[in-house]
Amino acid sequence: MTTDYAALGRASLERLHAATGRARQLQLEELEHILGCNAASAYGRRYGFSDIRSVEDYQRRVPLSCHEDYEPYVERLLAGERAQLTCAEPVYYAITSGSTGVPKYVPVTAEDMLVHYNGIYAGVFGMVREYYAQEQPEALFGKIFQVGEFARTRLPGGQMCGARSASLYQWLDRDGGFDASDYCVPKEVLFPDRVEGLTYAKLRFALAERGLTAIHGVFLHRVVGVLDYARENWELLLHDMEHGTVDAASGLSGPWRRKLEG
């Protein structure tokens, strides 16, 4: 392991447990922080963030809103304007599935990414360590099978974009520095250059990795789908692994076929 997942998770849970004892005060401090940091943004100026001194002030000044209310600000951000919704520049644009109409763009800042990393991503390791308290860390934190892939997708202006569930990994590798050595697949499988179904390829690597200790997925249904694929294509996978071949039924494109056959 290159990352101390036990320590990372322990620190995350310690922060969580400490926060639960003063949740209301932390929420008030967070509101004050958000208002102070974004008072000079277009949205903050519109609703007078700099003059808000209490929750009641906030409730009086800032109306309930939906995504339509933010769309003009997002459009200006995408056009190159700055400090619209937040003073910090977005580092990622999450794109919704469009299930209720046209897909929506949701700007995400670096601060939000750090909250995601230190709370959600790291917290999972803490919960695993806490639940299996009698196990040694090396028995829990070996090679990882991440069932998702995080294609390097960008908007025409160069901003990182994609599904919110992929955003953290894309951001962690924003400069190409994400260390994938703890994962059972090569880095190019985790971060393909384009969106492509790579379940077959990932399973080939996962089934061959004897040090595998964890299966990761943002959504459980994705994990179930990968396991269903393995169950339904068991003989094909084993045959190809034994003979170093890639069956046409894998659906892989030429470059990926050549990587596995080579």
Language model regions located:
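Active-site phosphate/ATP/adenylate-binding loop shared across adenylate-forming ligases
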Residues: M1-L26, L31-G262
